[in-house]
């Protein structure tokens, strides 16, 4: 049984997907967003090591509250722990639970066959991806996160090709992302 590194769990999320959500914050993120509200999730291999059953114990004990919601994974970057995520979502999917990944898309590796096979397996048990596009401009994105947005935008296109439901999320920060030309460019993307 795989164990994941979990930062924390929120039992009543209302902004992390449809309905009331059980929100699991994964530990580890390669991005260094200047406005990150969870910088304590950045370091991998910290947090609490938990099995899928341990993570979901609180969800199943409160299941009546989630009938129009489900489970959302966020972070950190949940796709850093792909094997654990696949095991988690496979169990939830088998039980008919709505699954959602809140991701930056930074882990997308289209040239890595192993990653792509795991991603396709994960997408079979994923109902929704909330994709956080931090900045549409490549240079501004790098200044904001310390990473290019190339893989992130490629991930968005891949999800579109696979017909995976996606909600694009974008944090509007005056002086950083709140510029008409960038918002229009993001809208056209």
Regions found by a protein language model. Give the residues of each.
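Short acidic donor-binding/metal-coordinating loop in glycosyltransferase active sites
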Residues: 75-76
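Short secondary-structure boundary micro-motifs
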Residues: 7-11, 48, 56, 112-113, ...
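Canonical Radical SAM [4Fe-4S] cluster-binding loop centered on the CxxxCxxC motif
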Residues: 2, 8-50
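N-proximal short alpha-helices
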Residues: 2, 6-9, 24, 28-29, ...
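Flexible, active-site-adjacent loop/turn segments at secondary-structure boundaries
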Residues: 7, 12-13, 39-40, 139-142, ...
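Conserved AdoMet/S-adenosylmethionine-binding subsite of the radical SAM
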Residues: 60-70, 79-189
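Conserved alpha-helical substructure of the radical SAM core
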Residues: 39-71, 83
């Amino acid at each position: 049984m795989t164990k994941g590194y979990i930062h924390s769990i929120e039992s009543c999320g209302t902004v992390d997907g449809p309905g009331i959500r059980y929100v699991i914050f994964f530990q580890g993120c390669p991005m260094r967003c200047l406005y990150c509200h969870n910088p304590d999730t950045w370091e991998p291999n910290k947090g609490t090591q938990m099995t899928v059953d341990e993570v979901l114990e609180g969800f199943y004990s409160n299941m009546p509250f989630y009938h129009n919601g489900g489970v959302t994974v966020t972070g950190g970057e949940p796709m850093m722990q792909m094997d654990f995520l696949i095991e988690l979502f496979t169990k939830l999917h088998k039980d008919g639970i709505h699954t959602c990944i809140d991701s930056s898309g930074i882990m997308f590796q289209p040239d890595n066959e192993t990653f792509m096979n795991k991603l396709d397996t994960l997408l079979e048990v994923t109902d929704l991806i909330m994709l956080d596009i931090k900045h549409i401009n490549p240079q501004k994105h790098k200044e904001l996160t310390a990473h290019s947005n190339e893989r992130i935008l490629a991930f968005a296109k891949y999800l579109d090709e696979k017909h995976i439901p996606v909600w694009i999320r974008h944090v509007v920060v005056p002086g950083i992302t709140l510029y008409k030309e960038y918002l229009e460019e993001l809208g056209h993307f």
